[in-house]
Curated annotation (Swiss-Prot):
It holds the Pfam family V-set. Residues 46-50, 150-155 are annotated as: Homodimerization. The keyword Glycoprotein applies. This is Cytotoxic T-lymphocyte protein 4. It is found in: Cell membrane. Residues 1-35 form the signal peptide. Homodimer; disulfide-linked. Binds to CD80/B7-1 and CD86/B7.2. Interacts with ICOSLG. Gene3D superfamilies: Immunoglobulins. One of its GO terms (biological process) is T cell receptor signaling pathway. The keyword Plastid does not apply. InterPro entries: CTLA4, CTLA4/CD28, Ig-like_dom, Ig-like_dom_sf, Ig-like_fold, Ig_sub, Ig_V-set. It comes from Oryctolagus cuniculus (Rabbit).
């Protein structure tokens, strides 16, 4: 009886393993079909702003009406995929669904506007949008071709003290130049006036012309 019971237990384990193998085979066969049934599109190239912020739209198309969707942003570098951020949201609530310091997102129907913050020049690479239709079944998954995000490092701002020194030097130069021009102009005006007058007033006695003669009146008496 003990041997019979062992055979029955072995038979049950064998049946369970076969069932699990069939389920795994079924998922492997139909997963590519589910992936092809969900098409994900995203822009090819995006240039990040000077503050390290990049935004792009991840849009998916599927005949399956899902109410629960999961969106994941992956970064591909050297043939390796790294998860940047991910969040599951419901389609009915078209609100901000990713609350993270790195990523934010707003869903609107089958479109998701993703924004990645805090990027630097080292973060330049291919960012792939992965969409999963979680509920109701069946499960669908799709990945976009990727968005190449270029991050240009902003030029460092010059030192404010250095700018103040430059401004002070320019102001001093202009002041000295204007002072020099004024001094030269005044000296030229004084030189022009010096031959005409000495600048000292002297009272001179009146002079009589030499040609003027004095005539004495002559009276003729009449008897």
């Amino acid at each position: 009886m003990a041997r019979l019971g062992f055979q029955r237990q072995g038979t049950q384990l064998d049946l369970a393993s076969r069932t699990w193998s069939c389920a795994a085979l079924f998922s492997l066969l139909f997963l590519p079909v589910f992936s092809k049934a969900l098409h994900v599109s995203q822009p090819a190239v995006v240039l990040a702003s000077s503050r390290g912020v990049a935004s792009f739209v991840c849009e998916y198309a599927s005949s399956h009406k899902a109410t629960e969707v999961r969106v994941t942003v992956l970064r591909q570098a050297n043939s390796q995929m790294t998860e940047v951020c991910a969040m599951t949201y419901t389609v009915e609530n078209e609100l901000t669904f990713i609350d993270d310091s790195t990523c934010t997102g707003i869903s609107h129907g089958n479109k998701v506007n993703l924004t990645i913050q805090g990027l630097s020049a080292m973060d330049t690479g291919l960012y792939i949008c992965k969409v999963e239709l979680m509920y109701p079944p069946p499960y669908y998954v799709g990945m976009g071709n990727g968005t190449q995000i270029y991050v240009i490092e902003p030029e460092p701002c010059p030192d404010s003290d250095f700018l103040l020194w430059i401004l002070a030097a320019i102001s001093s130069g202009l002041f000295f130049y204007s002072f020099l021009i004024t001094a030269v102009s005044l000296s030229k005006m004084l030189k022009k006036r010096s031959p005409l007058t000495t600048g000292v007033y002297v009272k001179m006695p009146p002079t009589e012309p030499e040609c003027e003669k004095q005539f004495q009146p002559y009276f003729i008496p009449i008897n």
